[in-house]
Amino acid sequence: MGRYRIRVATGAWLFSGSYNRVQLWLVGTRGEAELELQLRPARGEEEEFDHDVAEDLGLLQFVRLRKHHWLVDDAWFCDRITVQGPGACAEVAFPCYRWVQGEDILSLPEGTARLPGDNALDMFQKHREKELKDRQQIYCWATWKEGLPLTIAADRKDDLPPNMRFHEEKRLDFEWTLKAGALEMALKRVYTLLSSWNCLEDFDQIFWGQKSALAEKVRQCWQDDELFSYQFLNGANPMLLRRSTSLPSRLVLPSGMEELQAQLEKELQNGSLFEADFILLDGIPANVIRGEKQYLAAPLVMLKMEPNGKLQPMVIQIQPPNPSSPTPTLFLPSDPPLAWLLAKSWVRNSDFQLHEIQYHLLNTHLVAEVIAVATMRCLPGLHPIFKFLIPHIRYTMEINTRARTQLISDGGIFDKAVSTGGGGHVQLLRRAAAQLTYCSLCPPDDLADRGLLGLPGALYAHDALRLWEIIARYVEGIVHLFYQRDDIVKGDPELQAWCREITEVGLCQAQDRGFPVSFQSQSQLCHFLTMCVFTCTAQHAAINQGQLDWYAWVPNAPCTMRMPPPTTKEDVTMATVMGSLPDVRQACLQMAISWHLSRRQPDMVPLGHHKEKYFSGPKPKAVLNQFRTDLEKLEKEITARNEQLDWPYEYLKPSCIENSVTI
């Protein structure tokens, strides 16, 4: 006879406990024991009890549990179960971290990560095969729109598997803040009913409520050329700027601009010429909002790097050449102030479109969802890469499902306020998806390709590279615990299936764009996993968090333009500028959604600080602790740097980076 001490931990979320009774079994290498005790798990509690077992169970392999219900199935969120065997046996952990529903028996394997084996009689092998078979029935792929990455098969949030849903606190906060934003928007519209909307200062009428200190600075400085240029490096969208290697063919200089031609060529030769080309927007149909046509452009901006490391704009071409306009008007800083301001506003509007659709929605949200669905379909809970990745896919499926039903859906926010809404955003997504490459998701490759390595003022680039290095060391630490040689990587069928699922299925045959279809070495696996974690954490933070700072003052990044782009400079008046920028309704909606999507989440989990313990044993824990130490060091470095800056760059401070895409 032996005495076992069992601890059952229940989640701390609302409604995690259950009034239903839970039955437990212990399963070891030598036998199985049904525990007579039945418990009613309480929210946030760890219940402990001892039980005598008549036979020697040997090494514990599984805990089985079954929730009995009478009349009502009261779901239970089980964190984990730990068991201490007779004598001096070490405590054994059985991680769960999922909802227990219905009356089926749930088997929890001991938490040691295990690679797949080829022994069909192995209980763990049978368990992982059954788990994957069940999961592949639950987590199915769907096509939201042709030509885009696949998504989870869920038309609405209630269709999602329970374990991918928001916890109750998150749901309540998300829905309450939507209502709070709508109320503030309504109050602002009422406030402006009897007011004029004729000059830029009139935007002050709605610039109250939900904003940030940085947004206030943007309001004061947004017309400055230096701040306009700064945003290409460190604003809401630092992903478009690149160093010029030649003068763009679309930049047609008319006669009389020989001096500008010489200046551009000089900067090009010095390696100090940069460009931001929005050609992806060319030909995208513009929205029609409440019967009024909106407008889009595809600008090109040429900038130079001053000796002090600051960018300055040199010329803006709002539209590319076309048969009806072979030599489009070029706008210069020396032009009449309102004409130059309107040209910059067109650039900022175009940047808003690419930022939200290409770099935010596609490159972080949709890529993260592909990683999440493939992980649930291909990697069982015992797999070390599942244990490693699962904290980084929390809430991603629900936030994306909500986006498809509220933000980019027919009649959603984009249709109501954004110039690419009404279907243009889907066409833009398709174009961007066709250009999505593996290298573009990896900062060392992307920044090198764009010629931005080593720029002293490129704060996003600096912080992204530092984080990539830290995440890469973390990945390598975990991978080398389980894959000591390249042949072990090549011989893991679950891992290889996961790779194919992402590239060939989720990303729709993306091998032509550099994504791998198999892993042949430790280093190849580590690079891919680093991309996965970076995309789901740091990159999303860099792209998401700046929305309130840079978009709350609407003239700095107008969500739509209501008049065609100017073709002459002399005719631009304040009426032209105000007639082009968003109206009161659109501006209020932009402010509300910018706050809702980029505010700090109340249940935010910082990068690397998840509480779930999926791994067992000291070695994975040591790797995670070193990761946290490295992040703390970077936090101090960024904090010290930012204290010396007029415009601190906070988005990649580790404490500001969420552990997954949750908003």
UniProtKB/Swiss-Prot annotation:
The entry marks the following residues as binding Fe cation, namely 360, 365, 540, 544, 663
Q: What is the effect of changing residue 416 to Q?
A: Reduced arachidonate 12(S)-lipoxygenase activity. No effect on the stereoselectivity of the oxygenation reaction
GO term, biological process aspect, one: lipoxin B4 biosynthetic process
Q: Which residues form the Lipoxygenase domain?
A: 115-663
Classification via InterPro entries: LipOase (IPR000907), LipOase_C (IPR013819), LipOase_C_sf (IPR036226), LipOase_CS (IPR020834), LipOase_Fe_BS (IPR020833), LipOase_mml (IPR001885), PLAT/LH2_dom (IPR001024), PLAT/LH2_dom_sf (IPR036392)
Q: What is the effect of changing residue 392 to Q?
A: No effect on arachidonate 12(S)-lipoxygenase activity
Phosphoserine modification sites are: 246
Q: Which domain of life is it from?
A: Eukaryota
**What's the Enzyme Commission number for this chain?**
1.13.11.-, 1.13.11.31, 1.13.11.33, 3.3.2.-
**According to its record, what are the GO cellular component terms?**
cytoplasm; cytosol; extracellular exosome; membrane; sarcolemma
A single GO molecular function, which one? iron ion binding
Give the similarity note.
Answer: Belongs to the lipoxygenase family.
Q: Tell me the protein's name.
A: Polyunsaturated fatty acid lipoxygenase ALOX12
Lineage at the top is:
Eukaryota, Metazoa, Chordata, Craniata, Vertebrata
